[in-house]
Amino acid sequence: MTILSLIIIFSFLGSAGAVGGAALSLVFPERVRKTLVPSLISYATGTLLGAAFLGMIPYAIEHTQASSILTTILIGIVLFFLLEKLIIWRHCHDGECEIHGTAGPLILFGDAFHNFVDGVVIAAAFLISIFLGVVTALAVIAHEVPQEIGDFAILLDSGYSRQKAFLYNLLSSSATLPAAVISYFSLKTTQAVIPYILALSAASFIYIAMADLIPVLHQKISIRDSARQFILLLAGIGTILFFRLNH
C-alpha cells in the first residue's frame, strides 16, 4: 500500500472520529455522555502526550538540530495560546463553556481550521514513517471524539437544531482529507520543512493535552474518578508505546 493511500485512509478515519463524536451526541442521552466523555478525554490525553514525546519530537530531532526543534515547539505553544485567546483553536468538552450561546459560527470556523491542520499533521507524519503516521492519526482520532461532543453542545446552545448541528459538524470534519492530500504533494518536494511541521504538531498536541484536557479532568476530584483517569491516561500512552516498540 502506498504512502498516499495510507494518508487518505487515516485522514478519512480522522474525519470519521469527528463525525462519530457528533453522532454520540445524537444517540446517547446527556447522562451517558457525562460518564463517557471524561473517560475519552483521559485516553485522548495519553495518546496526545505519547504521540508528541514518543513519536513526533524524537523523529523531528533525528532529522535536524535539537535546539531548532525545541525552539519551534516553544514558539508553537505560545502561538496556540494566542490562537486560543482569539477563539480560533478553542476546545470545549462540556456544556458549560463560557463561549456558549454566541459562538456557533466561530466554533464551526475554528473546528474546520483545526481539522485542516489535523490533515497536514497526518500527512507530514506519514512522510517520515508509517509508524509515526499511525500513532499521529490515532491521537487525532482519540481527541476528535470528545472535542466534537463539546462542539455539538455549543452549537445546540447557539440555537442550532440537532440535525443542523450534526450536518455542520460533518462539513467541518471534511476538511481533514483534502488538507492531507494537498500536504502530501506539497511536502514531498519540501522535505526539509517536515521536522518543523512535526515540532509544531507536537506543540499543538502538548498544548491541547496540558491546557485544555487535563484541566477538565481536574474537575472530578474523587479517588475513584482520579484512579480511572490515571489508568486511561496511561493506557493512551501505552498504546503509543506499543506501536513504537512493534513498528
Where in the sequence are the language-model features?
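Intrinsically disordered, metal-sensing/regulatory segments
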Residues: 1-247
